[in-house]
Amino acid sequence: MMTQMNYTGKVKRVAIIANGKYQSKRVASKLFSVFKDDPDFYLSKKNPDIVISIGGDGMLLSAFHMYEKELDKVRFVGIHTGHLGFYTDYRDFEVDKLIDNLRKDKGEQISYPILKVAITLDDGRVVKARALNEATVKRIEKTMVADVIINHVKFESFRGDGISVSTPTGSTAYNKSLGGAVLHPTIEALQLTEISSLNNRVFRTLGSSIIIPKKDKIELVPKRLGIYTISIDNKTYQLKNVTKVEYFIDDEKIHFVSSPSHTSFWKRVKDAFIGEIDS
């Protein structure tokens, strides 16, 4: 969905976030040198209007989590300095094009849904998080046994390595490698995909990815106490005695700078997984 922020006559506050690779540092240095003397821009990592991520999708995920509490005020734009990145609109040799587009920018944005996760521990504490791609729950040392509940109704009893819940844009990441479907981000939904489920005459699950609409809620209720590995995008945590994990579509969205260089979702999918097709 395309919307617009009001930037009329406003100096744009820009944060530049780069990984440690040589080419990323070169790109960041060029951007710093241009923006520091430009009266239309103000370089600041505090309360930015625009966050420029330099690196790859992992760097964009890190930038998202740096500013996940300011999503209503921030727009992101990615520059890729390696192989093609799914979230990036610019390559490292297109810095001048990015600068020109930002100078012409009128606040237009492309918005994608994100995931909200609430993890309840046995002492009553609730750990909350947001994910741009996916959240996974695994129990490494033993088979994970958990009830999957949709809208307060038990759907199935799961036995296997774990469960992944992804956003539409995250459907092209780990979810796809698990055999899940690719979901267009204008469809505000979550996708639940099993990780190595046990299916036989005794234990059965649906065995297919499930698409959950925005108004619905997924709950995962582990049946055994112990240590669970929970991943939120590119961050992994070891949590003891998890009693419930809840998943929702967040009311907030991530916003990307919309410009002539913004790549459509299906072109991103084609470039990432198919490439050029011989006629």
From Swiss-Prot:
Q: Which positions are annotated as binding NAD(+)?
A: 57-58, 133-134, 159, 161, 172-177
Catalytic site positions = 57 (proton acceptor)
Q: Name one GO cellular component term.
A: cytoplasm
The record's section on InterPro entries has: ATP-NAD_kinase_N, ATP-NAD_kinase_PpnK-typ_C, NAD/diacylglycerol_kinase_sf, NADK
Which chain positions lie within coiled-coil regions? none
- The top EC class, named as a word, is transferase
Look up the domain of life of the source: Bacteria
Q: Which reaction does it catalyse?
A: NAD(+) + ATP = ADP + NADP(+) + H(+)
GO BP terms in the entry: NAD metabolic process; NADP biosynthetic process
What EC number(s) is this enzyme filed under? 2.7.1.23
Q: Which Pfam families match?
A: NAD_kinase, NAD_kinase_C
Task: Enumerate the UniProt keywords alphabetically.
Answer: ATP-binding, Cytoplasm, Kinase, NAD, NADP, Nucleotide-binding, Transferase
For this chain, one GO molecular function annotation is: metal ion binding
Cofactor(s) needed by this chain: a divalent metal cation
Against HAMAP family, the record matches this protein to: NAD_kinase
Q: What job does the chain carry out?
A: Involved in the regulation of the intracellular balance of NAD and NADP, and is a key enzyme in the biosynthesis of NADP. Catalyzes specifically the phosphorylation on 2'-hydroxyl of the adenosine moiety of NAD to yield NADP.
Entry's family note: Belongs to the NAD kinase family.
Q: What is this protein called?
A: NAD kinase
Organism, by scientific name, is: Streptococcus pyogenes serotype M28 (strain MGAS6180)
Q: What is the lineage of its organism?
A: Bacteria, Bacillati, Bacillota, Bacilli, Lactobacillales
